[in-house]
A protein has these predicted regions:
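Immediate post-signal-peptide N-terminus of mature secreted/exported proteins
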Residues: 19-68
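Hydrophobic h-region of N-terminal signal peptides that target proteins for export
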Residues: 11-20
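Compact alpha-helical subdomains of small soluble proteins
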Residues: 74-133
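A ubiquitous, low-specificity "background" feature that marks scattered single residues
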Residues: 9-12, 63-65
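Low-complexity, compositionally biased segments
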Residues: 6, 27, 60, 81-84, ...
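Bacterial N-terminal signal peptides that target proteins for export
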Residues: 1-11
């Protein structure tokens, strides 16, 4: 029975990552060079930046829901089977740790992308300030 339970859990764990195809990480927009960009280019880029950041948040919501669904889809186990319980708990922890890493990476990219955008905005504003008589 223990081997059957482990086999079922293993087969579900192999199948579950296929569900991950529904959440696509958004493509990062290209930022204009603030030292040469027009006002229109900067305004368009600002819209793209906001859309990208919102899309990353949607991606994070999506992968979080996928993980909840994947954990809920794990097969029922005999709670008296300590090996099965331990195996299931280890799998849930592994998935939680992986989700946390994905969240951290996405939030780090949001931060760094925001910093790059702010650098271009500063370059644009500095150029405009220099052009004033």
């Amino acid at each position: 029975m223990k081997n059957l339970t482990k086999s079922i859990i293993a087969s579900v764990l192999v199948a579950v990552p296929a569900f991950g195809l529904a959440c696509d990480y958004p493509e990062r927009p290209t930022l204009p060079d603030g030292s040469t960009a027009s006002k229109e280019q900067m305004i368009a880029a600002q819209s793209s930046v906001k859309a990208f950041l919102a899309a990353v948040d949607e991606y994070l919501d999506c992968i979080e829901q996928e993980e909840k669904d994947a954990i809920a889809a794990l097969p029922e186990i005999d709670e008296s089977d300590e090996d099965a319980v331990t195996s299931r708990e280890a799998e849930i922890k592994r998935r939680d740790d992986l989700l946390a890493k994905r969240f951290d990476a996405a939030n780090e990219e949001k931060f760094l992308f925001g910093e790059k955008w702010n650098q271009q905005v500063r370059a644009y504003n500095d150029r405009k300030a220099e052009q004033k008589p």
